[in-house]
């Protein structure tokens, strides 16, 4: 953090924030600064070899991209159809990252969303194309959005149609 600070930058977020999530090990002590919680989670996990994050100029101070407006283009890492089939069949999505494991339980309707994640259409377009009620779609997407914490989902307009 001192290197960023010296360069006039601040950390906007980590590429895989789940690595720095202290709640995987213990409750965050009251008053503990976030930088210390990240360092403690890192020490407890023992799996972080390289830190990868997003830096912005201090004057910008913004967080990760928000999907709330619907204009973001989600990009899924991996084979979207394979993920869709697995979710349709089991309603579960196993998550693994350098010794960190979890399982996301999802309604089988989520498979339609995974199938539509082509890296070209915005969330609003995907929602309209799936035929899922807009309120239900947003509720369901809120359950999928944490995939970005695992490095399995990001937002990009590079391939936008």
For each feature predicted by the language model, list its residue ranges.
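Long, low-complexity, charged/polar intrinsically disordered regions in eukaryotic proteins
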Residues: 42-99
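Acidic/polar loop patches that form or flank catalytic/metal-binding clefts of enzymes
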Residues: 9-16, 62-64
């Amino acid at each position: 953090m001192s290197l960023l600070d010296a360069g006039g930058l601040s950390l906007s977020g980590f590429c895989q924030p789940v690595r720095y999530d202290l709640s995987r090990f213990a409750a965050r002590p009251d008053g503990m600064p976030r930088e210390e919680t990240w360092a403690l989670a890192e020490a407890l996990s023992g799996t972080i070899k390289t830190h990868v994050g997003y830096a912005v100029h201090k004057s910008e101070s913004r967080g990760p991209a928000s999907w709330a407006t619907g204009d973001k283009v989600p990009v899924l890492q991996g084979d979207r159809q394979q993920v869709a089939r697995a979710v349709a069949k089991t309603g579960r999505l196993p998550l693994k990252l350098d010794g960190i494991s979890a399982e996301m339980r999802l309604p089988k309707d989520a498979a339609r969303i995974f199938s539509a994640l082509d890296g070209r259409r915005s969330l609003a377009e995907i929602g309209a194309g799936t035929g899922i009620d807009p309120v239900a779609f947003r509720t369901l997407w809120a359950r999928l959005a944490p995939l970005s914490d695992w490095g399995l989902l990001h937002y990009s307009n590079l391939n936008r149609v």
